[in-house]
A protein has these predicted regions:
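Long alpha-helical, hydrophobic tracts
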Residues: 111-118, 164-169
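Short, solvent-exposed loop/edge-beta patches enriched in aromatic
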Residues: 51, 60-65, 93-98, 115-119
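Conserved active-site alpha-helix within GNAT-family acetyltransferase domains
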Residues: 116-120, 126-145
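A broad, structural surface signal
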Residues: 19, 23-27, 104-112, 116, ...
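Conserved acetyl-CoA-binding loop-helix of GNAT-fold acetyltransferases
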Residues: 90-93, 99-112, 123
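Short coil/turn motifs at secondary-structure junctions
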Residues: 74-76, 96, 129
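Long, low-complexity intrinsically disordered regions
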Residues: 115, 145-155, 162
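Short amphipathic alpha-helix that is part of the acyltransferase structural core
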Residues: 2-73, 80-83, 87, 153-170
Length: 170
């Protein structure tokens, strides 16, 4: 950590801090893309009385949240046996606090805690190349869909397929 980071606090969120955590996430994500409402998008995590404050690792400067990483515990059932996992998300740094190493510090702290606490795995979405620094690699299933003239003929008799195109969903 550099000299600036030695003057900041890294801590877990506490009960009652959900409004501040939610405001911070909504602000940062809304600044970098479209308007966000995490309470609506993820009600189990950010709904009222969800109790999720403690899943959040926070960097504070002068008491104000400047960066955040959520590590939400999940229990997966694999071959009939429970597997402790964590979903990493809401990774965010205030626009004025970028470049200070806060995301790296929070990700390292969260990953170390998960290892120490016996979690078998963690997963996330988002900018995968960014998270490869922390040991994440793309995995999983990929679905491919093929639409042929025969598919169209059975669903839409008389349609030739000329002029039909598919576009990726965004």
């Amino acid at each position: 950590m550099d000299a600036e980071m030695s003057e900041i606090r890294i801590e877990k969120g506490c009960a009652g801090e959900l409004p501040d955590i939610l405001d911070f996430a909504n602000y940062v994500f809304s600044q970098s893309s479209q308007p966000h409402d995490f309470r609506r998008l993820l009600p189990k995590l950010y709904g009222e009385n969800s109790g999720s404050e403690g899943y959040h690792y926070l960097v504070r400067e002068d008491g104000r949240i400047r960066a955040m990483v959520c590590a939400m515990p999940l229990s997966l059932l694999v071959a009939g046996k429970p597997l402790r996992a964590a979903g990493i998300g809401t990774v965010s740094v205030h626009p004025y606090a970028r470049g200070k190493g806060y995301m790296k510090a929070l990700m390292n702290r969260a990953m170390e805690d998960l290892k120490t606490q016996g979690y078998a795995m963690a997963f996330l979405g988002g900018m995968r190349q960014r998270y490869e620094y922390f040991g994440f690699t793309p995995t999983g299933t990929r679905a491919s869909f093929h639409l042929t003239a025969g598919n169209l003929a059975h669903r839409y008799p008389g349609l030739s397929g000329d002029g039909v195109s598919l576009s990726p969903l965004e």
